Amino acid sequence: MSYRGLTILGCSSQQPTRHRNHGAYLLRWNGEGLLFDPGEGTQRQFIYANIAPTVVSRIFISHFHGDHCLGLGSMLMRLNLDKVSHPIHCYYPASGKKYFDRLRYSTIYHETIKVVEHPISSEGIVEDFGNFRIEARQLDHLVDTLGWRITEPDTTKFISEKIKAAGLKGPIMQELINKGIIKVNNNIIRLEDVSYTRKGDSIAVVADSLPCQAIVDLAKNARILLCESTYLEEHAHLAKNHYHMTAKQAAEQAKRAEAQQLILTHFSARYNTTEQFVQEAGEIFPNVFAAEEFCSYEFPKNAN
């Protein structure tokens, strides 16, 4: 089974600090590497995290404020240098096309990799690969900003003891999957009698935004919600003025969405530590963590 986990490569907001780099988040999922919002210095963060940049297959830019995209050009150049053979898919708001091009071609280099652009102009399902799908929703920020949801489908798992007891094997198994009900030796067998549904995982990634319904929709029953929480509640006026959230507001979104786990990120440089973020959010949503650089949050496939 391939590794599944979310690695924090950076968790600061507009200004990096001595201990927090610009944001960048790597989701390794079903054999793919999904990189979200690579800020300045991201390729160096891969070195510190002891992860090869070549795992990246898809790059997501929520919006084109610098702390969410300044690492894009250097990451593409690094992937060229490493001569990756797989295409690099890039997803971003269509209104930011000119900024994407400026970042991609900001320096002189010989591009050899295949970059597949996905400028997104409407909400909904962006792509569906069968084993997972990508959804985008418009957030409430100062510029066009997208939030993301990565979802894998539910799967049917057979219960071996019940399959054996029912005398099922070979082609008749596929017939049961296709029809949902079959007759075997004068017995009616329903799919739900000999199987259970394994709920597919989903992860929501929410960058800069005020609280909004789109966040709740993206994070609905998600296993992980990675959510910006730039400020503490004592600076709620700054959050409102700059179209950001507090830790409390992020927790409220997670609670409304009934997410399983909340990871706070995008911390303002005014805060030296993040303990208060966890404390503030935890009063509303207990299963909460503050992102830490190079920490990985693993999530093996659900057993049920």
UniProtKB/Swiss-Prot annotation:
GO molecular function terms listed in the Swiss-Prot or TrEMBL record: 3'-tRNA processing endoribonuclease activity; zinc ion binding
Binding site for Zn(2+) 1: H63, H65, H141, D208
The enzyme's E.C. designation: 3.1.26.11
Key words of the record: Endonuclease, Hydrolase, Metal-binding, Nuclease, tRNA processing, Zinc
Active-site residues annotated for this sequence: D67 (proton acceptor)
Cross-referenced Gene3D superfamilies: Ribonuclease Z/Hydroxyacylglutathione hydrolase-like (3.60.15.10)
Pfam families: Lactamase_B (PF00753)
Assembly mode: Homodimer.
Protein name: Ribonuclease Z
